[in-house]
């Protein structure tokens, strides 16, 4: 059975959809991807998301459920609110940081998403709660 990195898959799907200025993108439904979508919506990077009824039967007979993420654009030229997404901690090389060493992204415009003992949270929330964790990705 193939093991995929759902975070990298999600970020790549969003990145590719932004390149073609798509309005929505389907991402594999896991607790982790739903929590990431909630953070992105709360911080204003995406418009909304919903649990899709669509399922897909893979070659192995596994049923995959998806969530639909609605991307957010501004102006008549349809400029995305997301400029760049950078994956930091990968399955082959995990990256951890204490709350004291967390740096602001893009001069405070962007954010860092962390996996902590209290769940997923942004760098600002981690600093205020004095919790460190695994740095999943940067977004600005």
Curated annotation (Swiss-Prot):
It is found in: Plastid, Chloroplast. PROSITE patterns: RIBOSOMAL_S8. Keywords: Chloroplast, Plastid, Ribonucleoprotein, Ribosomal protein, RNA-binding, rRNA-binding. The keyword Plastid applies. One of its GO terms (molecular function) is structural constituent of ribosome. GO terms for biological process: translation. Part of the 30S ribosomal subunit. One of the primary rRNA binding proteins, it binds directly to 16S rRNA central domain where it helps coordinate assembly of the platform of the 30S subunit. This is Small ribosomal subunit protein uS8c. It comes from Euglena gracilis. The gene is rps8.
């Amino acid at each position: 059975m193939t093991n995929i990195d759902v975070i990298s898959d999600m970020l790549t799907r969003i990145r590719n959809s932004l390149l073609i200025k798509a309005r929505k993108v389907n991402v594999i439904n896991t607790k982790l991807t739903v929590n990431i979508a909630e953070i992105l919506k709360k911080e204003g990077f995406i418009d909304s998301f919903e649990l899709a009824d669509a399922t897909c039967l893979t070659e192995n007979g596994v049923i995959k459920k998806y969530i639909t993420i609605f991307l957010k654009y501004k102006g008549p030229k349809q400029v995305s609110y997301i400029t760049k997404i950078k994956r930091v901690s990968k399955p082959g090389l995990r990256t951890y940081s204490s709350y004291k060493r967390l740096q602001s992204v893009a001069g405070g415009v962007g954010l860092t998403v962390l996996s902590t003992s209290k769940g997923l949270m942004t760098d600002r929330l981690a600093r205020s709660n004095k919790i460190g964790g695994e740095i999943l990705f940067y977004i600005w």
